[in-house]
Amino acid sequence: MDFAISTEQRGRWQYDEPAPGREHFIEEAFDGYRQQARLLQPDVERAPPLFVVGGARSDFTRLNPLLYRLQRQGIGSLTANLSGHSLASEPGAEGASLAINLDEAQRFVQHLSGRCRTLLGHSLGAAIALKLAAQLPQIDKLVLICPAVYPDAAHTEPFGPAFSAAIRQPWAFLDCDSYAFLRQFNGRVLLVIGEYDGLNSKAHGQGPGTSAGTRVLRGVSRYSPIPEEVTHALLRSVPAPHAECLLLTDCDHGIAAHLRDVPQVADQVADTVAGFVLDSE
């Protein structure tokens, strides 16, 4: 249902900044807690709204530099706060997990009344978006920004030590049915990846099938939590004619911060995503 955001609630957002157009807020009641989502609506709609699944430690304002630009270009979006990731989502579900986040996302996407054709997943949110897409037959486009993929067994583990242990096992990320989903997905996929994310782990002193982690390269600290093999496995799973990839130079896994710090890159990413969404081929 639509509801009015209070000053106290705004104070819990990561970024309280004015939207370039209309915004509406939706609240859903779950088992013992509530979560909110924000719908950005363009003045002139050129495409159905995206459903956006944010990354770890994100609320629905984290991707403002991208989502506001898309709103100006006629593409709206609905983004929900998911349990376990931000001050704005607290208290949230007890024992929050990817599976609980998926349930929350499923509830919120229903507010788009089946109009949504594109899912956008950021980092951890990409793992959830892939699971969500498998349940929504109308989805024909996926935008995956610095995507993470986790073993299926990790999806029910509560965030914390158990979840971390499950995802840090070498090669565990291959134990996921999202690759099989992509192999039969008839739609198109856009990957947006930082140049210094998905670094080769062996080249940086780590074991195969793991991430390179944080590395200092040419005097600059670079964060690469995504194993190189995850990106390769995703690209292998999507038929070549259906896959596009935008590589952001001088950028690591922190794409959300990079878009905020470098407006011209935010322009580039927004233009690429808008072109992808609006392309009817």
Give short role names for the model-derived ranges.
Residues 56-68, 203-204:
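The serine-hydrolase catalytic nucleophile loop
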Residues 94-112:
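Alpha/beta-hydrolase active-site loop
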Residues 47, 53-58:
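Active-site glycine-rich loops that stabilize anionic/oxyanionic intermediates
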Residues 2-42:
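N-terminal cap/lid segment of alpha/beta-hydrolase-fold proteins
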Residues 251-263:
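Catalytic histidine-centered segment of alpha/beta-hydrolase-like enzymes
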Residues 71-89:
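Conserved alpha/beta-hydrolase
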Residues 185, 191-193:
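Short beta-strand/loop motif that positions the catalytic acidic residue
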Residues 120-129:
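Gly/Ala-rich beta-loop-alpha elbow adjacent to hydrolase catalytic centers
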